[in-house]
Amino acid sequence: NLYQFGNMIKCTIPKRLSWRSFVDYGCYCGKGGSGTPV
């Protein structure tokens, strides 16, 4: 859900990055940075 997605983002990227930076960055989700790119 949206709450879990928000927590996932917080755990995955540095706080200095904005939402726009996150979208451009294309982060990998999951422990150790592994998983499916978003």
From Swiss-Prot:
Catalytic activity: a 1,2-diacyl-sn-glycero-3-phosphocholine + H2O = a 1-acyl-sn-glycero-3-phosphocholine + a fatty acid + H(+)
GO cellular component, one term: extracellular region
Designated name of the protein: Phospholipase A2 2
InterPro entries: PLipase_A2 (IPR001211), PLipase_A2_dom (IPR016090), PLipase_A2_dom_sf (IPR036444)
Principal location class: secreted
Enzyme Commission number: 3.1.1.4
Cofactor annotation: Ca(2+)
Alphabetized Gene3D superfamilies for the sequence: Phospholipase A2 domain (1.20.90.10)
